[in-house]
Amino acid sequence: MSLFDHKISELKELLHKKELSVSDLVDESYKRINEVDGKVQAFLALDEEKARAYAKELDEAVGEKDELGLLFGMPIGVKDNIVTKDLRTTASSKILQNFDPIYDATVVNRLRDAEVVTIGKLNMDEFAMGSSTENSGYKATKNPWNLNTVPGGSSGGSAASVAAGEVPFSLGSDTGGSIRQPASFCGVVGLKPTYGRVSRYGLIAFASSLDQIGPITRNVEDNAYVLQAIAGVDQMDATSANVDVPDFLSSLTGDIKGMKIAVPKEYLGEGVGEEAKESVLQALKVLEGLGATWEEVSLPHSKYALATYYLLSSSEASANLARFDGIRYGYRTDNAENLIDLYKNTRSEGFGNEVKRRIMLGTFALSSGYYDAYYKKAQKVRTLIKKDFEDVFEKYDVIVGPTTPTPAFKIGEKTSDPLTMYANDILTIPVNLAGVPGISVPCGFANGLPLGLQIIGKHFDEGTVYRVAHAFEQATDHHKAKPEL
């Protein structure tokens, strides 16, 4: 049994009793990375020397402290688009291949306050644009359940590292499903918080109105622990919400009697695989057995979500990625005779194909003559999608459905057709457009590959999302399954 099979609360208890040391946990993490990361390819950079030194420092402090930090001594992996001071951060792009940040993201600072140990940086799709981690500028991460399949994306390294037992939890970011989809593919728990719940300061931006940082863990309780540590308003991020942070752990009661669950017919319709549908129907039976009731509802504008998302996110990416020009930081071409050539060649050599595709799409959508027809119309549809969710939440506590239409697909299977790749996020994208919280928890298997149940809540009501997810988890054994590597 791995140390990381224990919950965070159990590990903290062992540390407090001095039956376990932080150095033991860090040793376990690097030992496992050495054993399996050659196959899984989750990590891009390791911070071993500093991690071991900090672990020793924390061990020495155990006897001197009355109270340990919320996540005291826990090893963590951080997605490579979250800046870490003096630890290379590339967003998995060649254009940032030698970028060493001079500051820490707010979430990294808050985790340091909670006394975690950063193990290293995790692979992802370049600039978080992708659903399979095949768009990384460095390597493709593999799914620990089947090394011939993708781990999902864009937080593929974050999900794979937790599923493979390399770290007990990780941070990811979610713009259109990039935490929940890989969590589903890898059989772990991933939460996209409400937009504004967690500071984005220090997150390398893809689409600023959609991006949100969140935790990936092995169980729901651990997920609540991590969100507790990173949530809250931040003066460095004007989009972070000045909303009280409740005690998320107090929501994990196991009691969902009388709760009303909505199941969108669009989430069990065309394009959703039979295995995903069946796993959700079985999950609903479990939730009924726990005292909840469910009814079918409609989110009528969700059919426009995919097109709306790609217009808006690509438009925002076009603006956000304009800063990577070869002048201020990152890669600079050697092949330029003038300033215009420098810009063009740096960007064409530094960005991968998917990033270029989305920059071009976004630039087109924002261009004169097309702005009203595309970008402005997409903003109006986004408002309608948000209204659909608000209407449902007037009568229901949560919305439930599959996280993804299918289990993980084979590496290389969808790279030649971007549209089939994009369609993989069709069930997660509406949540980002509406800005509401959503979690994926393991709910079954298809052909030996995990499936995820998506539970969606009202704005700033992660507590109820956690309550339902935890009750389901406690009534099933799906989260206990581990891949064999």
Swiss-Prot record:
The keyword Protein biosynthesis applies. Its EC number is 6.3.5.7. It catalyses: L-glutamyl-tRNA(Gln) + L-glutamine + ATP + H2O = L-glutaminyl-tRNA(Gln) + L-glutamate + ADP + phosphate + H(+). One of its GO terms (cellular component) is glutamyl-tRNA(Gln) amidotransferase complex. It comes from the Bacteria. Disulfide bonds: none annotated. PROSITE patterns: AMIDASES. GO terms for biological process: translation. The keyword Nucleotide-binding applies. One of its GO terms (molecular function) is ATP binding. Heterotrimer of A, B and C subunits. This is Glutamyl-tRNA(Gln) amidotransferase subunit A. It comes from Bacillus pumilus (strain SAFR-032).
